[in-house]
């Protein structure tokens, strides 16, 4: 049992990173047997790992259809963006309430904007020093990771937008970061119909 648990924990981490990296598209099925073959393991730890990802909202398990990357409706995606915004704004409030002990460490340079966005939001959550809040941000951040990959081409000036967020964070300018985060998520809520349609089109190309 310990070997199975260890293997399933390893697989959980690998598949989670694959989802964040956009290896699987929203709506795409993940076949446990294929994953087991790729990692040369049995189905049991694979199913444990996939079920754990279902519990965290990164996958869904549909009757007779198996494990899939969630394909949100317009309402669900708006709710997800709204929730992410509220969590990050709350984290900023916690951080602003404390004296600045040291300047935030610079974010490592990377042209991968979805990855850098995940890292920045995770850092904001972690620096709030509130375990439950950081946990909620981490899970919501993970749920949005595959969506960020799928819709990246729809966002104009994404690099400049991320630079504005990082600049406000590095300056410890919480009012500016608050307003920039709100504007960031408002733009995405306005694009929800286009994002959902784009993801549906990409999913149809899988068949």
Model region roles, listed by residue range:
Residues 18, 23, 125-127, 167-171:
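Hydrophobic side-chain positions on well-ordered alpha-helices
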